[in-house]
Amino acid sequence: MKKALVIKFFMGNYLISDIETKDKITAQVKGKLKNYDTHKKELFIIKVGDIVIYENYLDRYLISEVLERHNELNRPNIANFNQVILVFSLYKPRFQFRLLDKFLLILNKYKLKIILIFTKIDLITKKKFLIIQKKISYYENFYRIYYVNSKNKNSTHHLMDIFSNKITVLAGQTGVGKSTFLNSLKPSLQLKTQEISKKLGLGKHTTKNAQLYEFNGGYIADTPGFSKLDLTIFDYEELKFFYPDFLLYSDKCYFKKDCSHIKEINCGVKKALKLSLIPDWRYDNYLKFIEKIQEQKKLNYNKK
């Protein structure tokens, strides 16, 4: 019995890398798969990043067990990573603070380390860049932020160290330049890139399945764009706990942890909002997310 890291899934097979030898092996699942979560009701699926037990049987390599995961995501299907790099374009597809906040909200729920990278800064005017950079700088209080010139391949070299000896998930809206960014880091990958749909202003999928690529002593996971960010994983009452900026002021709320930061009196978060310590758009997005969750929950209830 040996341990391996799942690198890729393709046509019912898994490309795995032996933990000790680093040999790449094509393996299949051996009958009923053993996994750490025996109480899980839904079908258990092997994910890229899983550590598995495999064996050699009649000249075939078979995966017999999946070891316990440290963390995982469902969109994309990936596990056991160290950090998430969110990639956003400042050109096309159009950058939206609401989408950024939505990503951050969901990833914060899973207590993941997040780094922000903004691409295509060379495709907008300097004036427009400075305006949007000023707003984005608010997030520097909580996350590391980098800007990338899509035409200058040397603009990514200073980012090499953040990948060192880590499994990094590269995520973001489709069409923002994730594959281009990866190619600039490691040209030998030669990942496919795509044109943006002129009609919709949205990206066309290039990456179809999550896959790990060896890089700088670790791995980079190029993932399919998040086609759907589902806020129904939240109860609207818990949303406030995943805003690190809200938490800075919530201890000053009269109702403490019970304050929703909406209609309550003596709310520390709303006071910070009035003092411009929290941006208007950030708070407005919070209200929109709560409204969306309540609407969806009500819709789901009526379907029963």
Curated annotation (Swiss-Prot):
Sample GO molecular function, one term: rRNA binding
Superkingdom as given in the UniProt entry: Bacteria
EC number: 3.6.1.-
Cofactor detail note: Binds 1 zinc ion per subunit.
InterPro entries: G_CP_dom (IPR030378), P-loop_NTPase (IPR027417), Ribosome_biogen_GTPase_RsgA (IPR004881), RsgA_GTPase_dom (IPR010914)
Transit peptide found in the keyword field: no
Subunit structure: Monomer. Associates with 30S ribosomal subunit, binds 16S rRNA.
Protein known as: Small ribosomal subunit biogenesis GTPase RsgA
